[in-house]
Amino acid sequence: MHHFDYSGGRLHCEEVPLQRIADEVGTPAYIYSERTLRRHVRVFEEAFQSIPHLTCYAVKANSNVNILRRFSEWGTGFEIVSGGELFRVLKAAGSASKVIFDGPGKTAAEIRFALESDILFLNVESGAEADLIIETARRLGTKARISIRTNPNVDPKTHPYISTGMKKHKFGVGISEARELYLRLKNIPEIELVGVTCHMGSQITQMGPFVEALASIGALIGDLKSNGIPLQYLDFGGGLGITYNGEEPPSPSCYAGAIIDATKNLGMTVVLEPGRVIVGNAGILLSRVVVRKSQGDKHFVIIDAGMNDLIRPPLYGSHHNIW
């Protein structure tokens, strides 16, 4: 945890004692370090500075409007998965020009909202969704910029609850289906094909899956180009993990190096969707002990926060340190 330290037996964030915050605003409360957020954005940007790229922070990782506002000030774009997240981004940034919209269940109303807000592009996850986008764009008299989320069927070697890039998952379409969909949409007047997208999951701590997926996507890009479909953006999603309990994920520079090597000759802008790697260790849940109790040989410490405030441990047994 950067900028969270003990001094005089008290936990501080950026030299501010958390006891003071608890006394002034109460608990439970989320406390974030702006210095940590700024540092992580800077490190990520510097890692990719040698190639054309756009960093689109994954809003799902933390949708606090004040955090989104800071990211906008620092020049990042945003990856969203709902109309509600788009609403938050517009409140924070005032523009959707650097917004990309993911998710297999976009509604007609959300697609309309996205097109009216002039987002950068929509990531299409099925042929049926493509038809809904065409219909919505036609009604609005506009053109939809789209990328197709392509499933490379690579095992990301992460927890099955947060794996998204294999055949058994609901996200995206397979390589061959993606090719057919690009060819079908090529001459649709309401559609502008601008990119190809791949996202394999979250909390990935090995480079192998990323490299394997890039090889598959690179072959598809070459195939499409030979069929008269040049693309501007390669959206490689997010998923880079962080350390919770001894994991050793690749550093941003190592991650960037593999992506740069695989994409530098494609002539495309690489879009990145970092989420937890930016915000994961930039904040804490500040809580207060309410009561202690024992039942048999079990001892409980009851606090004023619940699983709704920090759901990962009860949902799938993830580890979080207690400070």
PLM regions with names:
Residues 1-144, 188-192, 219-222, 226-229:
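A charged N-terminal "starter" segment
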Residues 58, 145-151, 197-199, 235-237, ...:
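Short beta-strand segments
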Residues 109, 155-160, 242-243:
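Short acidic/His/Gly/Ser-rich catalytic and metal-binding motifs that mark active-site loops
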Residues 116-117, 126-192:
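Conserved anion-binding
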Residues 143, 217-219, 223, 255-266:
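Alpha-helix-loop-beta-strand connector modules within alpha/beta enzyme cores
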Residues 200-201, 234-243, 274-276:
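Glycine-rich beta-strand-to-loop/alpha-helix junction loops that act as flexible
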Residues 206-212, 243-255, 281-291:
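Short glycine/threonine-rich loop-to-helix capping motif typified by GTGT followed
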Residues 258, 267-323:
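Charged (often Lys/Glu-rich) extended helix/loop segments that serve as interaction or gating elements
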